Amino acid sequence: MHKKNRHNQGYNFTALVKAHPGLLQFIIKNQYNNQDTIDFANPQAVKALNLSLLKSEYHVKFWDIPDGYLCPAIPGRVDYIHHLQDLLAATPKTLLPNKTPINVLDIGTGASCIYPILGQREYDWHFVASDVDPISIKVAKHIISSDKSLNRNINCRLQPNSNQIFNGIIAEDEFYHLTICNPPFHSSLAEASKGTARKIKNLNKGNHSSKNQDKTLNFGGQKAELWCPGGELAFIGKMIKESKAYQKQVLWFTCLVSKKDHLSKLKLSLKKSDAKQIKVIDMAQGQKISRFIAWSFYDVN
């Protein structure tokens, strides 16, 4: 994990239960080391853990999402935020317009609105949080309206056209230092279901409980969160094409890339689009390696 990640040392379940007593019912023993953990294949357990973390570490008093919506793991999400800050810090000052605060566009914020919440709490960034799902936007608005700082810094916008990403969201007079995105990885519902089942099987290896092995879709996630025609390669490809129209309004476009094999094709697309800077930033959470691709139409010189 990033050196600034608050969760580098694992979870302090005593403190987490104190922050949110509802977590206690989900704590179990890991069968290999007998340490406290939760069943990460149980979305209710992950939801309770998230609320505990948000309360204890980020001072967010209210956070709730409907059943069936993606419940993100906070340590990995905040890692993306810290690496984005590193990206900005490494950017020549001549490319950083004298505009404060830092403005960020989150594509596909989801009902959890997790990236804007973490970005506001860690760096006081300002966000536009967009999504194609009206329920996600409604829930996200409800969450941020309960906190003055979040409400001041985060603006939720519905994307009315599911075939568009930046179009219809970025206004003519707006400038963003960053765009961020956790794209739909899979190309079909069947592929998404297989991926979820595989994750559940792997997670259950470390727990006594195996009762969740048949809950194939219980990780949560609506269609737009999990899959789209062509999967992440097609989605990011569309993002690259649209980004050209906003090359003067965005300093860094970024997007998570699940499959490393996609990087070569994405880099080629970016070169054809005349991107001036292309970066791939690796992130590690335990044995898991994730990454995001970043591009800019601003020349480093």
UniProtKB/Swiss-Prot annotation:
Family: Belongs to the methyltransferase superfamily. METTL16/RlmF family.
GO molecular function: 23S rRNA (adenine(1618)-N(6))-methyltransferase activity
Gene, per the UniProt record: rlmF
Top-level class of the enzyme under EC nomenclature: transferase
GO cellular component, one term: cytoplasm
CDD domains: AdoMet_MTases (cd02440)
EC number: 2.1.1.181
Organism: Colwellia psychrerythraea (strain 34H / ATCC BAA-681)
Top-level taxon: Bacteria
Gene3D superfamilies referenced in this protein's UniProt entry, alphabetically: Vaccinia Virus protein VP39
UniProt keyword list: Cytoplasm, Methyltransferase, rRNA processing, S-adenosyl-L-methionine, Transferase
Function comment: Specifically methylates the adenine in position 1618 of 23S rRNA.
Compartment list: Cytoplasm
Matches recorded under HAMAP family: 23SrRNA_methyltr_F (MF_01848)
Reactions it catalyzes: adenosine(1618) in 23S rRNA + S-adenosyl-L-methionine = N(6)-methyladenosine(1618) in 23S rRNA + S-adenosyl-L-homocysteine + H(+)
Main location: cytoplasm
Gene Ontology biological process terms, A to Z: rRNA base methylation
Designated name of the protein: Ribosomal RNA large subunit methyltransferase F
